């Protein structure tokens, strides 16, 4: 089971701007004009959170299954109007996530201007969630300066740094979500896909690789995930354990 098998809320940001730019290019969409000033946030399902070894049941391969390697935090009680300068006391735990996404369902959903729903199935989380102080110097100003490694079908496809290029810190994300609401202890807040501009760092989701292939060769050549595929997500320092999942058929 996930550290929290159910949560009051699961809220995911998109704080790595390189990811936003690449994925929007992949669906021929422009980044918002407020990209650097106003965080992107969506609210996912929190009643069914997957554990680090739970298989992912793929009901329709044509939906375009993709993994997304992320860092997330668990909040304590967070008052409405909490500012970034006050948010450190709200962040209680840090862990990893695999924010599964069904890419082929995204364009039609977003075209309706009402956000993600069917394209965001249950999210998986690392075995362990640790207090920020356990990260030592790796926890700086609301960012986890850890290296997130994604291993797809036994091959390392990404070793991305989660700290320096996280444009909006977790504290800034807290300020954004608390603008009009308060949050109960146990709310989970995600960073979005960890992504670096340096292509040598690799990828934390297949959508980025497909976009890079399109930029370089005119079309994507990497398919989305299929039954039998595996994904392993872990961080250095390894405080959270590894998420290791296999895609299975319905």
Question: What spans do the regions from the language model cover?
Answer:
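Short beta-strand edge segments in extracellular beta-sheet folds
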Residues: 246-250
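Hydrophobic alpha-helical bundle architecture
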Residues: 160-185, 196, 209-221
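Residue-level detection of beta-strand-connecting loop/turn positions
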Residues: 154, 235-237
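Conserved metal-binding segment of the jelly-roll/cupin
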Residues: 45, 51-52, 125, 183-195
């Amino acid at each position: 089971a996930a550290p929290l098998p159910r949560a009051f809320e699961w809220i995911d940001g998109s704080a790595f701007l390189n990811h936003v730019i690449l994925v929007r290019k992949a669906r021929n969409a422009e980044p918002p004009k407020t990209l650097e000033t106003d965080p992107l946030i969506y609210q996912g399902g929190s009643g069914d959170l997957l554990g680090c070894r739970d298989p992912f049941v793929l009901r329709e391969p044509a939906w375009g299954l993709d993994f997304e390697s992320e860092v997330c935090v668990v909040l304590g009680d967070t008052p409405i109007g909490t500012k970034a300068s006050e948010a450190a006391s709200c962040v209680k735990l840090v862990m990893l996530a695999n924010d599964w996404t069904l890419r082929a369902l995204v364009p039609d959903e977003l075209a309706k201007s009402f956000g993600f729903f069917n394209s965001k199935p249950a999210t998986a989380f690392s075995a362990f969630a640790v207090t920020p102080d356990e990260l030592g110097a790796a926890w700086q100003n609301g960012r986890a300066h850890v290296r997130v490694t994604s291993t797809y079908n036994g091959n390392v496809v990404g070793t991305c740094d989660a700290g320096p290029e996280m444009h909006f810190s977790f504290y800034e994300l807290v300020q954004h979500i608390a603008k009009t609401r308060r949050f109960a202890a146990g709310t989970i807040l995600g960073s979005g896909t960890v992504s670096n501009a340096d292509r040598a760092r690799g990828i934390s989701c297949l959508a980025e690789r497909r976009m890079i292939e399109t930029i370089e060769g005119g079309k994507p050549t990497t398919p989305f995930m299929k039954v039998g595929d595996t994904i392993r997500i872990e961080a250095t320092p390894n405080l959270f354990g590894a998420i290791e999942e296999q895609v299975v058929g319905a």
